[in-house]
Structures are given as C-alpha cells and as structure tokens.
C-alpha cells in the first residue's frame, strides 16, 4: 500500500467513525486500517479501509443486530462514495466564499459542494451567478449527503421536483408492498416475486435508517470474517 492510498483509507475510516457515532454506534480506535464498531455493549463488525464490512455470524444472530449491521453497511457505502469524490474534487472558488469547499457535482446553474470539518463533511448546494464567478441561495444540509444530492438534481434541472419521491413517501410505499405480500393470500408466486423485486428497488432508494422495519439483510452484500 502506498502512502497516498493509506492516507485516503484513514480519512475514509475517520469520516465513517464520525457518521457512526452520530447514528448511535460506538467505535474503537482504528487499527491496521480497520475500524471496529460496537453496538449495545458488544462488538458488531469491522470496516476495512477499502469499505468492506466484516463480521462474525454469532454477532448478528437477531433482527435487531441484523438491522444495526445493515445500518453500518449503508453508512460505509455512502461515506465511501462521497469521500472518493472528495479526494480529487477541485476547490470551489467563488467571490466572497471563504473556507474549504470542494466541488462534488456541477451541472447547469447548480453546484454541490462538500466542506470538511471536525464534525465530518458538511454539504451545501448553491446556484451560480450569471458569470459563474460567485454563488448564491445556499441550501445547507449539514451531514445529510442524500438530501443534498436530491436537492442538487432538482436545482440543476437534471430531474423535475415533481418526479422525486420524498423518503417518507418511499417508506410508505415499501411498507404498503410488504403488507400486501403478507396479507393477500390470493397472490400468485410470480406476482409475489414481482412485488419482492419492487420492494428491493424502493428500499435501495431510501437513505440510511429511513426504514424502521425491514427484512433481514442479505449476507451476500457483506464480507464474512
């Protein structure tokens, strides 16, 4: 591992540790490019500097621990996404703007920026001035990366606002599909599979921890230790 790769992995793990603490997890000191994660006074898993989540089967033997593990996986995936972009993102230079803001996405009249702080990366969207030398009308999302991305797609014109579902709406759709699958005894096997696939697609659009009830996570998405 070269020094640049090692430094990037440490930054990812440090940022992930901040996010996990904000979500109620306990983390131990980083050791050998791995971040130990604890939940309810017990070791839950480890996150590698490359983003893999490693766990022991006996540590996730209940629905609650499986949900907690899925939350860690979602957090690691999200953090890995924006930290990889941030690593090579250009500085946002705008008249009157001070501080370390880096361009994560830039399209049309809108820009999405990340701002590294001691409390983790903070996210904001702006609209460019007509000459693209300044920005205005900032929407600040603190650590909510998913919300910042949704706002950017609308402000940039990539997606019309009416075409987007809010997380609460998606969660309601997910639970409605789950209710139909559980209660409708007349469902054919094929129709049930179609609804299961639709639930998976809807669940994939939801931000971390948006669902309070979910199926046990697929082990195929995790790395066994």
What annotation goes with each model-predicted range?
Residues 217-225:
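Non-Sec secretion/translocation targeting segments of pathogen effectors
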Residues 39-68, 75, 81:
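Long, continuous compositionally biased terminal/linker segments
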Residues 161-212:
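Charged/polar low-complexity intrinsically disordered segments, enriched in acidic residues
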Residues 82-122:
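Short N-terminal "domain-start" leader segments
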């Amino acid at each position: 591992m070269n020094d640049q790769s090692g430094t990037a992995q440490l930054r990812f793990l440090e940022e992930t540790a901040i996010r996990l603490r904000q979500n109620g997890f306990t983390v131990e000191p980083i050791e050998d490019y791995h971040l130990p994660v604890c939940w309810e006074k017990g070791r839950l898993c480890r996150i590698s500097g490359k983003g893999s989540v490693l766990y022991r089967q006996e540590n996730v033997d209940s629905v609650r621990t499986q949900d907690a593990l899925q939350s860690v996986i979602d957090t690691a995936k999200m953090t890995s996404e924006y930290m990889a972009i941030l690593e090579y993102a250009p500085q946002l230079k705008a008249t009157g703007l001070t501080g370390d803001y880096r361009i994560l996405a830039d399209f049309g009249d809108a820009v999405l920026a990340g701002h590294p702080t001691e409390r983790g990366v903070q996210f904001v969207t702006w609209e460019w001035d007509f000459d693209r030398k300044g920005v205005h009308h900032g929407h600040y999302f603190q650590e909510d990366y998913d919300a910042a991305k949704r706002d950017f797609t609308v402000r940039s014109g990539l997606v019309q606002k009416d075409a987007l579902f809010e997380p609460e709406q998606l969660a309601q759709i997910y639970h409605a599909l789950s209710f139909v699958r559980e209660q409708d005894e007349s469902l054919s096997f094929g129709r049930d599979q179609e609804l299961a696939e639709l639930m998976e697609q809807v669940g994939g659009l939801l931000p971390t921890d948006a669902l309070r009830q979910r199926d046990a996570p697929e082990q195929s998405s995790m790395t066994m230790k």
